[in-house]
């Protein structure tokens, strides 16, 4: 059984005891799409060849600005899922965030049906968290372009979710932008070197931020 985690900041395919991670960023490289960390490494070097909103804006509306042969964001999602699935086949369960609109879920299921997998179930990501925690709580999710908060209730050993509240603009990429700006200002004030003036040094700065955030989880400063 396969499990697809559909948060664009943590897109994962779980298969048996292993997982494949490809966050929702696409890079058009010599006519071919590449996704995940490979695309992330080019985000500041080649911004015109990057799209990081195709999951957030999943639809069949014409893609603007254009990015290669994709007609719309649904085409990019299809290509992303092809890359994520690889040679996987069989039944698949979708873990869907509360931020995904019903029309987007319907479109996603249609895309899934064109791939060598069969959707056998859809579950709310927050319900999975609630079942794991086994008590009432609020599930805060960080997506690429927004955050969301979903209340979770427990009754008779079952987790149920309330209405998801969206926090537009408070996503992972916005957080990284804000941190990069603050760090860049410190560089300028202390060394007169501005890492954001050149694409290569700006990219290097951006790539360091996730590991800095991880370190701050256990350290007061880094």
PLM-predicted stretches and their roles:
Residues 1-29, 131-162, 179, 209, ...:
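Gly/Thr-rich phosphate-binding beta-strand-loop-beta motif of the actin/hexokinase/Hsp70
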Residues 45, 49, 72, 76, ...:
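Charged, alpha-helix-enriched surfaces in structured cytosolic catalytic cores
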Residues 9-95, 213-220:
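Conserved phosphate-binding loops in N-terminal lobes of ATP-dependent enzymes
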Residues 154-222:
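Phosphate-binding glycine-rich/basic clefts of nucleotide- and phosphate-handling proteins
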């Amino acid at each position: 059984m396969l499990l697809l985690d559909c948060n664009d900041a943590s897109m994962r395919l779980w298969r048996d005891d292993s997982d494949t991670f490809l966050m929702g960023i696409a890079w058009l490289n010599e006519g071919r799409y590449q996704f995940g960390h490979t695309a992330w490494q080019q985000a500041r070097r080649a911004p015109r060849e990057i799209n990081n909103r195709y999951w957030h804006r999943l639809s069949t509306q014409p893609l603007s600005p254009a990015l290669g042969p994709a007609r719309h964001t649904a085409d990019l999602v299809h290509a992303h899922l092809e890359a994520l699935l690889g040679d996987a086949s069989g039944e698949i369960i979708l873990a869907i965030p509360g931020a995904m609109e019903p029309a987007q879920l319907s479109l996603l299921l249609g895309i899934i049906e064109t791939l060598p997998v069969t959707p056998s179930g859809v579950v709310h990501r927050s319900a999975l968290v609630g079942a794991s925690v086994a008590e009432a709580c609020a599930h805060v999710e960080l997506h690429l372009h927004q955050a969301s908060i979903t209340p979770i209730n427990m009754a008779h050993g079952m987790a149920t979710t309330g209405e998801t509240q969206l926090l537009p603009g408070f996503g992972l990429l916005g957080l990284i932008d804000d941190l990069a700006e603050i760090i860049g200002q410190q560089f300028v004030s202390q060394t007169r070197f501005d890492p954001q003036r050149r694409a290569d040094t700006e990219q290097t700065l951006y790539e360091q931020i996730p590991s800095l955030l991880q370190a701050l989880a256990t350290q007061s400063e880094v």
